[in-house]
Amino acid sequence: MSKKLHIKTWGCQMNEYDSSKMADLLGEYQGYTLTEEAEEADILLLNTCSIREKAQEKVFHQLGRWKTLKDKNPDLIIGVGGCVASQEGKAIKDRAQCVDIIFGPQTLHRLPDMIDQVRRGEKAVIDVSFPEIEKFDRLPEPRAEGPTAFVSIMEGCSKYCSFCVVPYTRGEEVSRPSDDIILEIAQLAEQGVREVNLLGQNVNAYRGATHDGGICTFAELLRYVAAIDGIDRIRFTTSHPIEFTQDIIDVYEDTPELVSFLHLPVQSGSDRILTAMKRGHMAIEYKSIIRRLRKARPDIQISSDFIIGFPGETKEDFADTMKLIEDVAFDHSFSFIYSARPGTPAADLPDDVDMEEKKQRLAILQDRITQQAMRYSRHMMGTVQRILVEGPSVKNPMELRGRTENNRVVNFEGQPKHIGSFVDVEIVDVYTNSLRGKFIRGEDEMDLRRNLRPSDILAKHKQDDDLGVTQFKP
């Protein structure tokens, strides 16, 4: 009888990526298969997020539900990972005795050893250290699960914004070697991946080592990835404005594989609040980045993050945020009411904005951005859009679903053979959360590169150095 693993994931795309690697790791080394039902599992893993309010309480509520399963099956192993695990450490075990393993985002690669320790009778295994690049060195071979894939290129953040727990839960910025990233993406392309999303807490701060002792910048990495045959779209998240340098903007000018959509968090439009947040830039500097981006890529659309009701935020500060939203014409946002994160500098500030006022401001902001998004969608009516077909439509499995370059879901009537490939559709209707398309042409009528073997990719761009080591040169 096969051993079963159940993983519950909360939080960001990096957590989703980490959870997929946990599943691959335990499948490869210990033969576990995933199950959607916690009741069927031999191991339960909770991958946590500490961004939202009451994150810790949410964890303990879930552990309380899992405790009933362990009461029935004492051999059940329960593990807690992610940012709350990194933040709380042993305190989780002190409060929830049912937990066997506590691991941080940088130690998930040690899970097989931790499980073995528990099987040998150890009461609790806790490892929330920050061993830097070791995690990436010990991850299993990449495995595609569709035409899109997330690839982690760096972890952590060294910006220490006053409201943010990331530097304390994931550590400071650590970049993967560029050759490792390129090889992983080439392997994914061989498996049919057409779009990659490069992940990092501060992805544009990437500075990865090269095999010859040099440093690969984020702009250079984007061009290397764009040169991999079969990869026709590149996205990345999340970025920081102070690292959004001109060389990255230049890539938008000459690299069509990089999509015309950017998520660039600003958090506030008030210079006073930005200073209190320790963001390291002013609103005018953010607008300067957007202005230069739109010069390089006129059709680019921008989304952002906003924190509403940060300590000391006045009506004037909020008005500055709304002015920025109007000036930039954001297409989408992730916006949240401020809640203090324990251990951050902002947690010591008086939370002096009334909750009803916060809710009202949030509603105003979200309504404005929804209006702007609908305006963009209506402008797409009658246009032909190239979409990557991801699978059946969520609401109607007899139809197909794809995503435009500017990150809009399009549902259309089409043949299953198009799943995993690009098609052109005419936009014929607009809804709040999706578009309606009419099939125009398939990929066989497009001029796209489809050389799927990494060996072919390397051979096409091969260049040996003095030691005979093959370098990848786009």
UniProtKB/Swiss-Prot annotation:
Compartments, as annotated in UniProt: Cytoplasm
Catalytic activity annotation: N(6)-dimethylallyladenosine(37) in tRNA + (sulfur carrier)-SH + AH2 + 2 S-adenosyl-L-methionine = 2-methylsulfanyl-N(6)-dimethylallyladenosine(37) in tRNA + (sulfur carrier)-H + 5'-deoxyadenosine + L-methionine + A + S-adenosyl-L-homocysteine + 2 H(+)
Main location class: cytoplasm
This protein's record includes keyword S-adenosyl-L-methionine: yes
Binding-site list for [4Fe-4S] cluster 1: 12, 49, 83
Domain MTTase N-terminal: from-to ranges: 3-120
Keywords: 4Fe-4S, Cytoplasm, Iron, Iron-sulfur, Metal-binding, S-adenosyl-L-methionine, Transferase, tRNA processing
Gene3D superfamilies: Methylthiotransferase, N-terminal domain, tm_1862 like domain
Top-level lineage group: Bacteria
CC cofactor: [4Fe-4S] cluster
Binding residue positions for [4Fe-4S] cluster 2: 157, 161, 164
Residue span, TRAM domain: 378-441
CDD domains named in the record: Radical_SAM
EC annotation from Swiss-Prot or TrEMBL: 2.8.4.3
Cellular component terms (Gene Ontology): cytosol
Pfam family name, one: TRAM
Role played: Catalyzes the methylthiolation of N6-(dimethylallyl)adenosine (i(6)A), leading to the formation of 2-methylthio-N6-(dimethylallyl)adenosine (ms(2)i(6)A) at position 37 in tRNAs that read codons beginning with uridine.
PANTHER family: CDK5 REGULATORY SUBUNIT-ASSOCIATED PROTEIN 1, MITOCHONDRIAL TRNA METHYLTHIOTRANSFERASE CDK5RAP1
NCBIfam families xrefs: miaB-methiolase (TIGR01574), MiaB/RimO family radical SAM methylthiotransferase (TIGR00089)
Protein name: tRNA-2-methylthio-N(6)-dimethylallyladenosine synthase
Record lineage: Bacteria, Pseudomonadati, Pseudomonadota, Gammaproteobacteria, Alteromonadales
